[in-house]
Design a protein with these regions (language model features):
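Terminal peptide-recognition signature
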Residues: 56, 74, 92, 104, ...
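Conserved CoA-thioester-binding segment of acyl-CoA-metabolizing enzymes
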Residues: 23-95, 134
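Amphipathic alpha-helical segments at domain termini/boundaries
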Residues: 30-58, 209-241, 250-259, 286-287, ...
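Crotonase-fold acyl-CoA enzyme core
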Residues: 134-247, 281, 286-289
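Glycine- (often His-adjacent) and acidic-residue-rich active-site loop
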Residues: 94-132, 263
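Helix-loop "lid/cap" segments that line or gate small-molecule binding pockets
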Residues: 203-204, 255-258, 274-279
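Catalytic-core regions built around general acid/base machinery
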Residues: 77, 128-139
Length: 302
């Protein structure tokens, strides 16, 4: 990736031209897609489509707790965007000073009075969060977490589940469940796959908060930027990604997560098959021809 900087010394990708069709060149726009009407999904989740980038913003003040309503809205948006080929990148951001405090403990506590002590509700809420993380991994588009503030528990899980994570220098992260007698078992799944193993265990066993620099050292985030540049840097990453072949991105993202769970020999065997099929795909042929012909490729819709 080609990187650049500015007067603030922020290292980030150079903006790349999006060579696919523009919205004005399409008969079918976002407004034509039922799942992406002008109305917001609900007040808890804000949606903004800008060319090939969809930004979903958590909006549940004061701490953007992942209530059932917010998670249902987020799950629905991820399901909807999965089939919208015009969108190449999804950014997940948040309003306020907290990215997300995780599950809505007040909402969950209310259900302790249920006949089963809240078991059914707890399972539904925790499983819904897990399903969202799986949707992110399976989404054909790249997903970037845009963090400014605290990401804790299931909020940290959300960050760890995204393909990339970019945060401000004042952001902090933790999995504090152990502090209240509730080990962060489901956040552990994402965290152990994003961060280095020993560091993930450190976060899970101590419940202590780490700063942005430590999160980057742990492998939880990709980049740290000053707050005023956060959106700009995320947008530039999104532009770089959106300029690539959607076919290659879809194939590559799926292959990345699948091979990561395989033994080494099996992973190579699988990856050989994936790469052979990718070589036969139209975009690979176009990309190679464009490279040899010293011109920009013209990607086809996947």
């Amino acid at each position: 990736m080609v990187l650049g900087g500015d007067a603030a010394g922020v290292e980030r990708p150079q903006a790349a031209a999006y060579h696919g069709p523009t919205y004005g060149e399409r008969e079918k726009t976002m407004a034509d897609v039922v799942a992406f009407k002008k109305e917001e999904p609900n007040g808890l989740l804000l949606r903004e489509a800008n060319g090939p980038v969809l930004r979903l913003t958590l909006n549940n003040p004061p701490a953007n707790a992942l209530s059932i309503a917010l998670m249902q809205a987020l799950a629905a948006e991820l399901d909807a965007v999965a089939v919208v080929k015009e969108i190449k990148v999804v950014a997940i951001a948040a309003t306020g000073k907290v990215f997300s405090a995780g599950h809505d403990l007040k909402e969950m506590t209310l259900h302790r009075a249920d006949e089963d002590g809240g078991k059914a509700f707890f399972e539904g809420a925790i499983r819904l969060a897990a399903d969202i993380m799986l949707k992110i991994a399976k989404l054909p588009q790249a997903v970037i977490a845009e963090i400014d503030g605290l990401a804790t528990a299931a909020g940290c899980q959300l960050v760890a589940s995204c393909d990339l994570a970019i945060c401000t220098d004042s952001s902090t992260f933790c999995t504090p469940g152990v502090n209240i007698g509730l080990f962060c078992s489901t956040p552990m799944v994402a965290l152990s796959r994003a961060a280095h193993r020993k560091q993930a265990m450190e976060m899970l066993l101590t419940g202590e908060t780490i700063d942005a620099s430590t999160a980057k050292d742990f492998g939880l985030v990709n980049r740290i930027v000053p707050q005023q540049y956060l959106r700009q840097v995320v947008d530039k990453y999104a532009a770089v990604i959106a300029s690539k072949s959607p076919q290659a991105l879809k194939i590559g993202k799926e292959a990345f997560y699948r091979q990561a769970e395989m033994p080494l020999a099996d992973a190579y065997d699988y990856a050989v098959g994936v790469m052979v099929e990718n070589m036969l795909a139209g975009d690979a042929q176009e990309g190679i021809d464009a490279f040899l012909g010293k011109r920009l490729p013209e990607w086809k819709e996947d």
